[in-house]
Regions:
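Cytochrome P450
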Residues: 1-221
Length: 221
């Protein structure tokens, strides 16, 4: 899909840098601020809105509804919460459908326009498929980006010598990012629930039993 080739992704760097610079400028003169809510949490959604050329007046509205979809991955979500999320999703789809059709008729340089022209097995994506992909893009980098930025800053303050090293040599940024991913990985654990009786390494699980898989332990051996 041309919208997601390495070259297309690389071209998003100026957009990301512009969004990050703007968010940092907003908090630079404040005596104190919340790094998570005012910077880290906003970066992925703001970047995605920029890439999609989403109207400014609808960005916060769309982000609130789409990001709520991440709750569907929670094994403890209630039926009432599912119903509420379904209403929000329907509102987003209703709003985005004419926007997608307009971009298909008059494509620009934004990601949404790219999706309207993308071919899979020789066929264009349907409007429904485009909206589903946009929602997936909003969700995919949210919690991971927010958590990695927040955890990385915490670790830098815990290790001021490493902070000073990174400040003195910005070329270490890529290596630092890789180390943060290892040391404070954004997905620490996964919850799984047995759909039926099963035995794994002599451990018996009955239907409904829940297990926590601690992925972070692999990076701390």
């Amino acid at each position: 899909m041309a919208a997601f080739t390495p070259r297309a992704v690389e071209q998003t760097q100026p957009t990301i840098e512009r969004v990050v610079a703007r968010l940092l400028d907003e908090v630079a003169e404040l005596d104190e601020f919340d790094l998570v809510s005012q910077v880290a949490q906003r970066i992925p959604s703001e970047v995605m809105c920029e890439m999609l050329a989403f109207p400014l007046e609808r960005r916060e509205w769309a982000a609130e509804r789409v990001l709520g979809m991440s709750r569907t991955l929670d094994p403890d979500i209630t039926p009432a919460e599912v119903d509420a999320l379904a209403v929000g999703l329907a509102e987003v789809e209703e709003y985005m459908l004419p926007v997608v059709r307009e971009r298909r008729a008059n494509p620009g340089d934004d990601l949404m326009s790219g999706l309207t022209q993308a071919m899979v097995d020789g066929e264009l994506l349907t409007d429904t498929e485009i909206i589903a992909n946009i929602i997936l893009l909003f969700l995919a980098g949210q919690s991971t980006t927010r958590s990695l930025i927040s955890n990385a800053v915490v670790e830098l303050f815990r290790h001021p010598d490493q902070m000073e090293l990174l400040r003195s040599d910005p070329t270490l940024d890529r290596a630092a990012a890789e180390e943060f991913l290892r040391f404070v990985g954004t997905i620490q654990m996964l919850s799984k629930r047995a759909l039926g009786p099963v035995t794994i390494d002599d451990v018996k699980f009955e239907e409904g039993d829940q297990a926590m898989i601690v992925l972070a332990s692999a990076n701390r051996d």
